Amino acid sequence: ATLLFKSMRNLIYIITKLFFFVNGELENSTSPGILWTPSQEEGGSGDNQNHISRTWIKDLKTISDFVKDKYGYDPGSYDKFDDFESKNWKLMARLDWNINKSHKLSLRFNTVKSENDASISSTSSVITKANSNRYGVDAFAFGNSNYGFRNIVTSLSGELNSNFSSSVQNKLLVTYTHIRDSRTTKGDAFPMVDIYKDGKQYMTLGTELFTPFNDVENNVFSVTDNVTINKGNHLITAGATFERQYFMNSYLRAPYGYYRYASMDDFMTGEKTMLYGII
């Protein structure tokens, strides 16, 4: 009984010195992504009103099987696309510690992460644009040519308030903030390929042109210390601040290369391209 009493007394003592709060949120939502579907008709026939591309589903299967066999690359789905997802994670935590009568410490942590799906750029290229949208009545793109956005914001702060005497107080604040905006790719790395038919855009496969290595990062670390002295009718504050910033922005257009072919046959037989771009 004596041991139990001592343990409970120590627990109550700790609780009165420590206060903490934790909150987490998770939000997931979906929305229609690719509204277009490939044509099921023999040879392919487009219907703008019903969002049917002229790209024949058998042609998509032919190219999919070809690149899988020759290059070991899976271009992704070409029918029955999943809805686009939007994911958001939030976490917040706070700890207040009454160290003693003279010193109080507060720690705060916040992080937010979001991911959102997006469809391939409609007409962009390395030099001249495609002459029609990559998802539309004239053309269709494989699923792994789409991409996503990823955003992360994380902050951590610590604040120590000290009373050295009735007339001398000190406040120490340390903060760190991390911000990163990047993109996510679908599938393995592969050059982006546009295939034309009858002089117009017909199908697209490969990694989206502007996604790989598209990354922005910003880190800030700071320390601020202020001493306040009460001199009767006068209040004197002196302090110092240190701040370190790190910023990075990377961008490469078509890092895996870009190729445009006049027809499916030209692509599969290795004929000369209409246009290409490599780093």
Task: Name each region found by the language model.
Residues 1-117, 148-170, 174-176:
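Transmembrane beta-barrel wall of Gram-negative outer-membrane proteins
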